Design a protein with these regions (language model features):
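Conserved donor NDP-sugar-binding/catalytic core segment of glycosyltransferases
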Residues: 100-132
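Short loop->beta transition adjacent to catalytic acidic/histidine clusters or analogous donor-positioning motifs
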Residues: 5-8, 29-40, 48, 59-62
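Acidic helix N-cap motif at the loop->helix transition within catalytic regions
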Residues: 19-22, 47-55, 96, 100
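Glycine-rich, basic loop-to-helix element that forms the pyrophosphate-binding segment
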Residues: 66-83, 104
């Protein structure tokens, strides 16, 4: 008998997530859509994350412990390389999937085969409250990539595995590896966001978007520069002039990463 592979492979890279990991995993396992595998990759956590993960006995979980701490992007690309599903879904160890997230995303993607990537709106939890709705259409998302407006919530995305296998995440741009990937994917096919909150996104002082915000911003600027170069838009300007323009344009927002982004 041929082995039946799951429709979705959920990638969950973790590092020192002991406070939230049980709730995050449970929210995935309790999805109304059940045809998935949950690939958890631990990046040498030194807290209780591993022992808490091992308490789960669900057969859909595939747990891997890296021998060396090599970073978030490396974990994601490893997960892509071993994924068995037709679709890749993302999840983080401090967030919560709402019960119908997978069902609604997979239904949309299956009905719209030209769409290669699908995100959703989010609800903030933790140290920030409110809801955030992202640009919905392919054209709106392309425009947003060149501003400081939010484009996707990384842990909400689901897309075709073949696209992730073709492109992978680029470690050079970590911790803005997701933003850089989006700039490549919009040139490959259509991307969208569902106008529905399907994930609770936790904001806390130890998350990467807070602890490494300056590096994240700089690498997002470099991603934009790469696209401008490809489009030959920057022929009369130096790299330094373009990066300075992008930084200065967005300077008012750098002191508060969520300024003007949250819709209550």
């Amino acid at each position: 008998m041929m082995k039946k592979f799951p429709l979705i492979s959920v990638l969950l890279p973790v590092y020192n997530c002991e406070k939230y990991i049980e709730e995050a995993i449970s929210s995935v396992l309790n999805q109304t859509f059940s045809d998935f595998e949950l690939i958890i990759i631990d990046d040498c956590s030194n807290d209780k994350t591993v022992s808490m993960i091992k308490r789960f006995t669900d057969s859909r979980i595939r747990f891997y412990q890296k021998e060396k701490n090599s970073g978030y992007t490396d974990s994601l690309n490893f997960g892509i390389s071993i994924a068995q599903g037709n679709y890749i879904a993302r999840m983080d160890g401090d967030d919560i999937c709402l019960p119908e997230r997978f069902a609604k995303q997979i239904e949309f993607l299956e009905k719209n085969p030209t769409i290669i990537l699908c995100g959703t709106a989010i609800k903030f939890i933790g140290s920030l409250s409110g809801n955030l709705f992202y640009p919905e259409t392919n054209e709106e998302i392309k425009i947003s990539l060149f501003s400081f407006l939010p484009t996707f919530a990384h842990p909400t995305i689901m897309g075709k595995k073949e696209i992730f296998e073709k492109y992978n995440y680029n470690k050079i741009f970590e911790p803005a590896e997701d933003y850089e990937l989006w700039t490549r994917l919009v040139q490959e096919g259509e991307v969208v966001n569902l106008n529905e909150i399907l994930l609770e996104y936790r904001v806390h002082s130890s998350q990467v978007s807070v602890t490494k915000k300056n590096i994240q911003d700089l690498n997002s600027y470099k991603s934009r520069l790469k696209i401008l170069q490809k489009l030959k838009i920057d022929s009369q300007y130096s790299k330094e002039e373009i990066i300075n323009f992008l930084v200065n344009k967005n300077l008012p927002f750098c002191f508060d990463p969520y300024k003007t982004r949250v819709l209550f």
